[in-house]
Amino acid sequence: MPATRNQDELVRTFKAILKEERFGSQSEIVNALQAEGFGNINQSKVSRMLSKFGAVRTRNAKQEMVYCLPAELGVPTAGSPVKNLVLDVDHNQAMIVVRTSPGAAQLIARLLDSIGKPEGILGTIAGDDTIFICPASIKTIDETLETVRSLFNYSE
């Protein structure tokens, strides 16, 4: 196999190996792509591709932490099935907390960060299944809470 291939083949192979849900590190992905004939691939390129396609680390059926792609690739929108991943939205006087399906928090936080300050969101911190939202102002936290809830058609 040639050492270099075109970008479409690389993307197709990258997506295919992530669907296997067995790669727990970026170096394992690099090795798999090199074994497929992409000799010019390196860790920084894999890192950029993981970010570009919204890959997240989640537990597979064997309970191992692995990289996988979300069902819908690209930047998610509120109209996509991502809203089905939100399980709970609650708040106190200073912060909004969103609970998600396991492995979905980073994907949803990415969407929330993209709407940002105009909708009252200063920033987010995401774990595996929990997102902390820092409102732009605690004076308008109730409005920000309603914005977040309406994005995901969530009602108590």
From Swiss-Prot:
Annotated signal sequence range: none
Keyword terms: Amino-acid biosynthesis, Arginine biosynthesis, Cytoplasm, DNA-binding, Repressor, Transcription, Transcription regulation
Cellular compartments annotated: Cytoplasm
Listed PANTHER family: ARGININE REPRESSOR
Job description of the protein: Regulates arginine biosynthesis genes.
Protein family (similarity comment): Belongs to the ArgR family.
Protein's UniProt name: Arginine repressor
Organism: Shewanella frigidimarina (strain NCIMB 400)
